[in-house]
């Protein structure tokens, strides 16, 4: 497969609409930060790998056939099973106009090479006649992230959207096609203190073991990073019931938050599952740029991707953070659709055949992939 390098750890082409953008040469920041996972490059001529199509299924909520992925397909999770990459992507029907006004469902696609996708005709997670209608009717199930335990249990963290409040929810599966919903991630924490908290974007800590990224622990507990306007953390004994980490004032502990003058000046939203390496814990995240107080190298409201290094023994301690994005909008389909200011929204990371495949949403409209050939940094020792 012929690959065209388009982004190092930082930098994009000014010719693609980003004035004053850094060049594609390896930057000093990349050279100084040997913990950064990458570089990632887009395979030439293959993206987007998932686009909308008029597939129909019977919707138990609407009690009729609906074209469940007709409008947009984006924000994908990714993992591997039986030698294939599995991509679980958010799909929107055409029931309304405007961001957040349609119904979202999670679709399934599989690939032997990470590029050519075989898709299921029906979604695998959606608003159903179940005990969770108050959580995901009518907005649906959004923005999945998926990680796997060593014994083959897949855990999905997704946003349950009832059009009143977005909340982080949990589902599990053994085959990635049949999912069991468990409800809100923070439902049992602190006597229900965070039941109605607006929360989303959960990234469970993983590590590379053999040929698979698997869920890891810190001090005997599972760990996830979560959040949109800031990055927080939570721990769990069972991967279903999660307890947000609190600070000395008994408030949510902020690990990072937006920075003036940077690409992440409006939002810092968790990306794919975090990864333990020999350098510590690497968290990839999505940053939104402010037009007034952000980085002038990137358009206002553009979504770019950053990386953060945390201490492997003290996972709430920040050791380093990139000042520039390692991945940013470049292709036309990343700068058109629902977010015309430009969006690469990373959510899925899969280790497959000695490469890393990073799946991302393009302007809330398509799914694309970038590839990293250098996976030595994933080694724990």
Predicted feature locations:
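Positively charged n-region of N-terminal signal peptides that target proteins for export
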Residues: 1-5
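Bacterial N-terminal signal peptides
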Residues: 7-15
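Beta-rich carbohydrate-recognition and catalytic domains
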Residues: 18-139, 147-266, 275-339, 353-381
